Amino acid sequence: MTVNILGTKYTVTKKKYSEDPAFAKSGIDGYCKFQLHQIVHCDMSTYPDWEDESPESIHNTEQQTLRHEIVHAFFHESGLSYNANTVDGSWAVNEEMVDWIALQGPKVYEAWRQADAL
């Protein structure tokens, strides 16, 4: 699948945990490779210790990971990925901020939709 991020096509790939060493090496369930225009996320049903999770929990976690990585891609394509540096690092790659946008984005979108603000 591809997704358009501000005019740049990113390939979105879902991989099994065992198919991508980055999951184990970095303790992550997704990542965005800006240079390659790739977003990769883990099939959470293959993630260690997730075998007892419900299909709904797996699905919701995978959606959250995709939203998170897409936010990273938007920041990068906006020129904000590493150009907003501070002493402690760029605000645009701050995981807490990216998580907030990824978690609250659907709610913000729904509020905009209800207000006919789209």
Which positions does each model-derived feature cover?
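Short intrinsically disordered terminal tails
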Residues: M1, Q114-L118
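Catalytic zinc-binding patch centered on the HExxH motif and its immediate surroundings
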Residues: M1-N4, K15-D52
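Post-HEXXH active-site segment of zinc metalloproteases
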Residues: S45-Q64, H76-Q114
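Short active-site segment of divalent metal-dependent hydrolases/proteases
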Residues: R67-F75
